[in-house]
UniProtKB/Swiss-Prot annotation:
Higher taxonomy: Bacteria, Pseudomonadati, Pseudomonadota, Gammaproteobacteria, Chromatiales
Membrane topology: Peripheral membrane protein
Protein's UniProt keywords contain Membrane: yes
InterPro entries to which the protein is assigned, alphabetical: Membr_insert_effic_factor_YidD (IPR002696)
Protein keywords: Cell inner membrane, Cell membrane, Membrane
Similarity field: Belongs to the UPF0161 family.
Protein name: Putative membrane protein insertion efficiency factor
Length: 78
């Protein structure tokens, strides 16, 4: 699953993104963020972090620098 998701992100970045323009309000871009999250945490957790990031990336969001969090910062407390 991890490799399939990473392949889709790479396809998006090189085949679709050049035609859509650079509109991401965050650094790193949403595709780079999601790719790093999936590589670090796997398909499910990394995909969830990427989806949350995509939902935050809209015209009314101020954006800024948003790195992939360390696991201790976003894991639920027990």
């Amino acid at each position: 699953m991890k490799n399939i998701l990473l392949s889709l992100i790479i396809f998006y970045r090189y085949a679709l993104s050049p035609f859509m323009g650079n509109h991401c309000r965050y650094y790193p871009s949403c595709s780079v963020y999601t790719q790093e999250a999936i590589q670090r945490y796997g398909g499910f957790r990394g995909g969830w972090l990427g989806l949350r990031r995509l939902l935050r990336c809209h015209p009314f969001c101020p954006g800024g620098i948003d790195q992939v969090p360390e696991i201790a910062k976003w894991r639920s407390k027990s």
